[in-house]
Amino acid sequence: MEILHDTVYNPAYNMKGQGAPESVVNARPGLDIGAASTWGNAVVDYDKKKLEKAAELLLADYDKLKNSAGYQYDLANVLEQVLSNTAQEYQKKMAAAFRSGDAEEFSTLSDKFLSIIDMVEKVTGTQKEFLVGTWTVSYTHLRAHETRHD
């Protein structure tokens, strides 16, 4: 827990814009990605290796805790952030390869970046809270409720 407090839970590191750093995975493709939204940021000031260590520690207890919904949610959330941090590094390297005209390196890095996106999808797909369908169904129910009370 201390690692999380010193990294992603630390307000000094995760409130630079309108909230926590946004993932480049969610951003419009580009060479210079500052954020996924117009009001956010993609600045990760904490030590990314520390968060990777937290993920390792969570995974080490998988067999003991796999039946805990809270553990599964936290694990998915931490793994998604580790993958997003990794994607950010690859995106920067891809941009550098593109700018230098190194098509082979750009292609290699692009393939790795796309595989990270696939991993993010698999990890977040384990939790209903991360699924788009969950949000659209909630909106539909909320909208129907509002319409009945108008």
Predicted regions and their residues:
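Conserved, mostly hydrophobic/aromatic
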Residues: M94
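Extended amphipathic alpha-helical segments with heptad-repeat/coiled-coil character used for oligomerization
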Residues: E129-Y139
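Short amphipathic alpha-helical coiled-coil/interface segments
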Residues: L83, A87, Q91, L109-E121
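Structured mid-domain segments that build the active-site/substrate or prosthetic-cofactor binding neighborhood
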Residues: M1-N77, Q81
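Conserved small/polar residues in nucleotide/adenosyl-binding loops
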Residues: T140-H149
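Amphipathic alpha-helical coiled-coil segments
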Residues: M119-E129
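Short helix-adjacent coil turns
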Residues: S100-E105
